[in-house]
């Protein structure tokens, strides 16, 4: 990692995006105290010294890789163990997090008998004991089925919205991260390539018409003449992107047919997080 400096507003959901080996898990492990830096300096909540950082970590909860718990004992007893370990007073804290993550009716169940989705919920419950301000999650939906993914997504959104908990998480499922995160950090080779909000991405990446025609050069010429616009890009594969289209999609189809050009593809699209990330990796020319 090299000078990774992120700023996250209270209650935001911060999505870390990057290829395998980019540094996502290493960064989250450093934040949560699972590993320590060989060199350099870590700052957390404005604190620099190891002693102060350890104190600040009381304000955090984390699930890194597989949640750790004892499979032979009940959900409730596992949480009671972690409550004591964290020095959180009052058994009521266990009941509160069980209710929060939707495990109150399964508290007597042994952990080995839980589904994968329920185990993920238990991991979150352990992280939430002590009412952390910051939740650090590494691949929280990894291995879940579609219904489990939806359950965890809804839970994290509720924690952010109702409890004002700040969440930093990584996920290789960018379509899911797109539905959850309010701000993104793109990591490349251990460096923060860009930090941008979901709203800023939306503003930079407006709807566009994607069209493949038999004669792209002639099509763009008649496009300019007919609609008085230069808001288009011709990609290396000759695909045309008409940015901020002012006409309905049928008008662009008629333009081709009136000028005797064949269309192989024509659709209205919105730039996805995956497309934005791939463009950023390739130099960030498309959506600058």
Question: Regions from the language model: what does each represent?
Answer:
Residues 191-214:
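Conserved beta-strand-loop-alpha-helix hinge in the C-terminal portion
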Residues 283-288:
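ABC-family P-loop ATPase nucleotide-binding domain
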């Amino acid at each position: 990692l090299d000078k990774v400096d992120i700023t996250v507003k209270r209650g935001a959901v911060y999505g870390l995006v990057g290829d395998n080996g980019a540094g996502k898990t290493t960064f989250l492990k450093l934040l949560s105290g699972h590993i320590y830096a060989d060199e350099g300096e870590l700052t957390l909540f404005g604190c620099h010294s190891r002693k102060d950082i350890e104190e600040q970590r009381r304000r955090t909860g984390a699930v890194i890789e597989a949640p750790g718990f004892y499979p032979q004992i009940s959900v409730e007893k596992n949480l009671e163990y972690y409550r004591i370990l964290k020095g959180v007073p009052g058994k009521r804290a266990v009941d509160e997090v069980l209710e929060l993550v939707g495990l109150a009716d399964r508290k007597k169940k042994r952990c080995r008998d839980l589904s994968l989705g329920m185990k993920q919920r238990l991991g979150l419950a352990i992280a939430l004991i002590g009412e952390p301000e910051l939740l650090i999650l590494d691949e929280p939906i990894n291995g879940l089925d579609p219904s489990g993914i939806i359950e965890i997504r809804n839970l994290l959104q509720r924690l952010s919205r109702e409890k004002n908990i700040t969440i930093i998480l990584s996920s290789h499922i960018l379509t899911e991260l797109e539905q959850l995160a309010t701000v993104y950090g793109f990591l490349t080779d251990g460096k923060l390539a860009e930090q941008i909000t979901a709203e800023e991405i939306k503003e930079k990446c407006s709807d566009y018409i994607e069209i493949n025609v038999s004669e792209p050069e002639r099509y763009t010429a008649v496009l300019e003449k007919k609609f008085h616009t230069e808001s288009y890009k011709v990609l290396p594969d000759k695909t045309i992107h008409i940015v901020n289209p002012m006409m309905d999609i049928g008008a662009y189809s008629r333009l081709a047919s009136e000028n005797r050009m064949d269309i192989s593809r024509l659709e209205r699209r919105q730039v996805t997080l995956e497309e934005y990330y791939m463009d950023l990796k390739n130099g960030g020319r498309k959506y600058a």
